[in-house]
Amino acid sequence: MTTQATPLTPVISRHWDDPESWTLATYQRHDRYRGYQALQKALTMPPDDVISIVKDSGLRGRGGAGFATGTKWSFIPQGDTGAAAKPHYLVVNADESEPGTCKDIPLMLATPHVLIEGVIIAAYAIRAHHAFVYVRGEVVPVLRRLHNAVAEAYAAGFLGRNIGGSGFDLELVVHAGAGAYICGEETALLDSLEGRRGQPRLRPPFPAVAGLYGCPTVINNVETIASVPSIILGGIDWFRSMGSEKSPGFTLYSLSGHVTRPGQYEAPLGITLRELLDYAGGVRAGHRLKFWTPGGSSTPLLTDEHLDVPLDYEGVGAAGSMLGTKALEIFDETTCVVRAVRRWTEFYKHESCGKCTPCREGTFWLDKIYERLETGRGSHEDIDKLLDISDSILGKSFCALGDGAASPVMSSIKHFRDEYLAHVEGGGCPFDPRDSMLVANGVDA
């Protein structure tokens, strides 16, 4: 094993392995970042100062788009009084559903109180007195753990009325969704939270102006909010000492697939896949890297030529993809790229809400063409049809679900067109899917 140039920086994940790490007692035993100390510090500051700290830290959204968190908070109208004043809301998007994305669920399971503390600080900053954590309904253990942690926070006086004697009140609700991937899109999430079918809204108006119940609303990802307490305690300079100039700080990288030690690796933004694979023991023994996703199934594929691309928003963007949720799905040479993209296409076809014609119809036809290619009934024209349909989807719907379906299609043809041609000219898939399978303990099937 070589020496890693970029050290891991466990901050959010530092105490995940502690016994009963999810309890309030354990959270408050931490040495450097003792639980709820950041909240106590924030409550002594004016709300606008808290926003300024988060803005100056350079924290960017960890849910995919990478928008500046402090800037998003500052969009909330401040100073409204009288009849014109509307309540402000904070919503945490914990509807983690995309293939390959798996960082928020272990975070909430291991240390739910860091999320709750971040929620209280963020709500105080934007002057919200009601906050919601919207969780994917299937993850029942996460829901139970969050409910227990919220109950502990209420009992300790960190939630409810007059928190810490500051005069600030906050009610926090943990809400279970019904399992629709589309509800990970922020405006569809708001519709679901209001009791309607989850579908993306036309913007403008943006949630900061007309969000939940038509009121100013901030929507942030779990990891984004969980990063706030350490910034309040550690300070701007400490946070900016990690990562890159435009993408400062630390983040969770999720390695899965054909890797020796899959899991969550917390590191500064800008680390490379080569370095992360070094920490993870490399690609599984006897195999080599073929392609990978930098941010889950909705981001354009990269290849072994991109091992040294800095994994920050600018570096990955310059390489032709997106950092997204930092879900690094690793595929070795035994994987059929056509089969992999077909599986993702089936997912997006199933999860399309049907509101926008390009996405609804486009994902259906993409799936039909992939079925032909995999079963030996494809043609050379089908490859061009995939690109044509993807172009008809890209950027032509209310949300980015259709874009996510088109991205792996277009990028896989760009990098592996010969493999598509082999499916046409060879009468079907030339790969044996058993070669790429893994059993539960990571040993070849």
Swiss-Prot record:
Q: Which species is this record about? A: Mycobacterium tuberculosis (strain ATCC 25618 / H37Rv)
User: Which of this chain's residues are annotated to bind [4Fe-4S] cluster?
Assistant: 353, 356, 359, 399
Needed cofactors, names only, are: FMN; [4Fe-4S] cluster
Q: What does this protein do?
A: NDH-1 shuttles electrons from NADH, via FMN and iron-sulfur (Fe-S) centers, to quinones in the respiratory chain. The immediate electron acceptor for the enzyme in this species is believed to be menaquinone. Couples the redox reaction to proton translocation (for every two electrons transferred, four hydrogen ions are translocated across the cytoplasmic membrane), and thus conserves the redox energy in a proton gradient.
Q: How is the cofactor bound?
A: Binds 1 FMN. Binds 1 [4Fe-4S] cluster.
Q: Know the name of this protein?
A: NADH-quinone oxidoreductase subunit F
> EC number(s) for this protein?
7.1.1.-
Residues annotated as binding FMN are: 177-224
The entry marks the following residues as binding NAD(+), namely 61-70
The record, for SMART domains, names:
NADH_4Fe-4S
* GO MF term (any one): quinone binding
Looking up NCBIfam families in the UniProt record yields: nuoF_fam (TIGR01959), PRK13596.1 (NF010120)
For this UniProt entry, what's an example GO CC term?
A: respiratory chain complex I
Catalytic activity, per the record? a quinone + NADH + 5 H(+)(in) = a quinol + NAD(+) + 4 H(+)(out)
Describe the family membership recorded for this protein in Swiss-Prot or TrEMBL: Belongs to the complex I 51 kDa subunit family.
What keywords sit in the KW lines? 4Fe-4S, Flavoprotein, FMN, Iron, Iron-sulfur, Metal-binding, NAD, Quinone, Translocase
Q: Which InterPro entries match?
A: ComplexI_51kDa_subunit, NADH-UbQ_OxRdtase_51kDa_CS, NADH-UbQ_OxRdtase_suF, Nuo51_FMN-bd, Nuo51_FMN-bd_sf, Nuop51_4Fe4S-bd, Nuop51_4Fe4S-bd_sf, Soluble_ligand-bd
Name of the top EC class for this enzyme: translocase
Q: Which GO terms describe its biological process?
A: cellular respiration
